[in-house]
């Protein structure tokens, strides 16, 4: 084999040596660099979404924010530049990896600061400034990831890679906790909240996160540059500048074609009526391949025109790929790429839908946060350390096999979680003297069709259901609705399902909803379209496009009320008419375990045909099953992830570390994430139990693929 190839070996170290490997200086370096890598991602996604939400802005309103994610998805596109381009002064002073790492970290601090000094509530200009900061943060954070991955691979031999991957992952998770939960706690401590937006709180929170990045900068400055034998290249400065220009135009072609290709895909889907998940996946794959082809064509044309040194362009973009196929041969290289693209498919596809799944099982945000963010993170780290430990004692391919078995088999535990609740009886919807029966699915969703003529004869539906094994648990819920008339009307929907607020519910904000009919939103006062009143206190409610209004009231305020009665008031513009509706409620110590949530019914017209009434039976599922499922799933994912990172690292050539690993890591998540985008559609069609069974079965071919790759690699190493 060429000397630049990393060979996977079978370790025979003792357990003591395996444990002490985690205290190696290189492992500690990766812990701190992992922390630095874990800070930015949540500042772009979840924490930013909460900030924008408190400022009264939907993140989706600015499509520019979606570009921030492109940096992570397509980092392999500019990874060759990171491998090839020297940084004036810094490369000679710090070395190739540390120079780029320092630049990336400084850009991250700058990007976070740009976001901190942007108040989205002040208007579009400030919102675009924040979007620019988010995009810069996405690309600079992805650049940091490229360099850290290359640094890790060059820092130690293959046998040590699982240890480095484990400590890197531990640092990454800690960084995510600081930027996620830590940022939210700090913002809340500084006083901001939903309905009480304070810009300075978010400003100082983001500046604090920028300050935390100094840990990464200090680490970069005090560690040593990896010693790697590389072929010295001597090109003119102008050659490098021209290379950057060609790269810029190629990337611009890729990004533009990928973004605008979405419009073409939408037109094709609409015109041909494509709804099949696999057909949609094929379209998305063609969109990605087409964008890559356009970038490649644009780059090739510029190279042929002499816009850049041809030899330099070949060494930058073609050599890394050619090297991989040259070292492993076409057959083995293609099989390796197949394994890389599909190894994590089972757990990534199930992971995409996980938060929605937990919510569908009626677990609270607090329960989900505790289970996922605390126990999930802890056992993911334990799984990573276990993977690193076993890698010192096992052949990496055997460990990959164990990881693949666990990653897919643990999805079966989620079927147990779905089955942990009581079986439900029929849902009976009664309108006047007419009854309609529905069978709820495994998470309680149900729907019935009721003729509008029947609904027009009443103003309320009655819904009752029970546990299939205990009819004494029957629950009866009423929901009022409006009949469409020419005159304006307003009414309040039940506060909770039955106007009863439990002591547990009173600990959080309660959303009060109601409906308007006979008027449009434009006819209401702009600043306060609907006001909710309770004991003289006023709370502003927002009105959506369906004329359903909603406003949040603190549960403690509802609990302390003397009247226990909410009034909704709508003031019409240029009109003295005021619409009012009242709704009393009661306090109870606790509520029944069985409940029914019914979606608001739009105002009824007698001649509109059948009306679809939807709802959800809310029952309790085992919290013990929830914690067990999350613990074993994250333990398996952590172990499989550590083994897989070590495997990917072993495939890279020292001459093209950054490029090859960036390609591998992007390929690792690209296919599963594209398929994962259709998880919701699949669940709707087949339900959760069959979905998790499907994700388990998907993992079986991967086991054969791991065995096949292991056999081919053994044969290859004998050559």
Spans of features found by a protein language model:
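Transmembrane alpha-helices of Major Facilitator/SLC transporters
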Residues: 75-78, 290-300, 371-394, 403, ...
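C-terminal ends and interior cores of transmembrane alpha-helices
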Residues: 101-124, 406-423
């Amino acid at each position: 084999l060429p000397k630049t190839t990393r060979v996977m070996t079978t370790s025979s170290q003792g357990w003591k040596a395996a444990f002490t490997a985690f205290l190696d200086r290189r492992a500690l370096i990766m812990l701190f660099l992992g922390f630095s890598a874990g800070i930015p991602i949540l500042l772009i996604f979840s924490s930013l979404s909460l900030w924008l939400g408190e400022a009264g802005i939907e993140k989706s309103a600015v499509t520019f924010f979606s570009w921030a994610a492109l940096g992570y998805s397509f980092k392999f596109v500019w990874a060759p530049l990171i491998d090839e381009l020297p940084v004036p002064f810094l490369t000679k002073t710090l070395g190739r990896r540390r120079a780029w790492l320092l630049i990336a970290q400084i850009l991250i601090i700058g990007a976070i600061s740009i976001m901190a000094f942007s108040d989205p509530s002040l208007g579009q200009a400030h919102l675009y400034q924040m979007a620019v900061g988010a995009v810069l943060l996405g690309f600079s954070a992805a650049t940091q990831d490229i360099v850290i991955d290359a640094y890790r691979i060059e820092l130690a031999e293959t046998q040590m890679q699982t240890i480095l991957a484990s400590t890197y992952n531990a640092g990454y998770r800690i960084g995510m906790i600081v930027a996620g939960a830590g940022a939210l706690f700090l913002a809340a401590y500084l006083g901001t909240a939903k309905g009480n937006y304070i810009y300075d709180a978010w400003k100082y929170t983001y500046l604090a996160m920028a300050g935390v990045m100094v840990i990464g900068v200090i680490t970069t400055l005090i560690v040593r540059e990896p010693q790697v034998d590389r072929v010295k290249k001597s090109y003119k400065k102008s050659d490098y500048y021209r290379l950057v220009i060609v790269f810029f135009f190629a990337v611009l072609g890729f990004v533009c074609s990928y973004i605008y290709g979405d419009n073409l895909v939408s037109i094709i889907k609409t015109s041909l009526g494509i709804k099949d998940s696999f057909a949609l996946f094929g379209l998305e794959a063609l969109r990605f391949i087409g964008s890559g082809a356009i970038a490649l064509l644009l780059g090739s044309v510029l190279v042929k025109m002499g816009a850049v040194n041809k030899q330099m362009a070949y060494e930058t973009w073609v050599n890394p790929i050619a090297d991989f196929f040259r070292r492993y041969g076409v057959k083995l290289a293609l099989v390796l790429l197949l394994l890389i693209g599909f190894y994590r498919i089972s757990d990534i596809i199930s992971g995409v839908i996980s938060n929605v799944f937990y919510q569908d099982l009626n677990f609270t945000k607090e329960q989900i946060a505790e289970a996922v963010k605390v126990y999930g993170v802890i056992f993911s780290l334990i799984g990573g350390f276990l993977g690193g430990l076993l890698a010192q004692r096992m052949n990496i391919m055997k460990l990959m096999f164990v990881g693949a078995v666990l990653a897919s088999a643990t999805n079966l535990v989620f079927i147990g979680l779905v089955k942990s609740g009581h079986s439900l009886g029929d849902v009976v919807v009664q309108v006047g003297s007419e009854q309609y029966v529905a069978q709820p699915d495994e998470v309680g969703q149900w729907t019935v069709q009721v003729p509008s003529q029947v609904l027009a004869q009443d103003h309320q539906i009655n819904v009752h259901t029970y546990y299939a094994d205990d009819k004494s648990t029957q629950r009866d819920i009423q929901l009022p609705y409006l009949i469409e008339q020419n005159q304006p009307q307003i009414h309040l929907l039940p506060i909770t399902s039955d106007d009863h607020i439990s002591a547990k519910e009173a600990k959080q904000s309660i959303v009060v909803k109601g409906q308007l009919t006979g008027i449009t939103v434009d006819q209401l006062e702009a600043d306060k379209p609907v006001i909710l009143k309770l004991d003289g206190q006023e709370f502003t409610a927002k009105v959506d496009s369906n004329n359903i209004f909603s406003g949040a009231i603190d549960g403690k305020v509802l609990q302390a009320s003397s009247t226990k009665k909410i009034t909704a008031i709508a003031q019409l513009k240029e009109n003295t008419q005021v619409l009012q509706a009242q709704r009393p409620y009661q306090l109870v110590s606790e509520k029944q375990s069985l409940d029914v949530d019914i979606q608001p019914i739009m105002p009824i017209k007698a001649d509109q045909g059948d009306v679809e009434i939807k709802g959800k039976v809310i029952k309790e599922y085992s919290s013990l099953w929830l914690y067990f499922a999350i613990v074993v799933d994250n333990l398996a994912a952590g172990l499989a992830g550590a083994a897989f990172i070590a495997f990917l690292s072993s495939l890279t050539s020292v001459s093209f570390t950054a490029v090859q690993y960036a390609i591998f890591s992007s390929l690792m998540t690209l296919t599963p994430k594209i398929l994962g985008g259709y998880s919701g559609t699949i669940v709707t069609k087949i339900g959760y139990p069959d979905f998790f069974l499907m994700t388990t079965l998907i993992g079986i071919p991967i086991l054969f693929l791991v065995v096949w790759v292991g056999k081919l690699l053994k044969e290859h190493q004998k050559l």
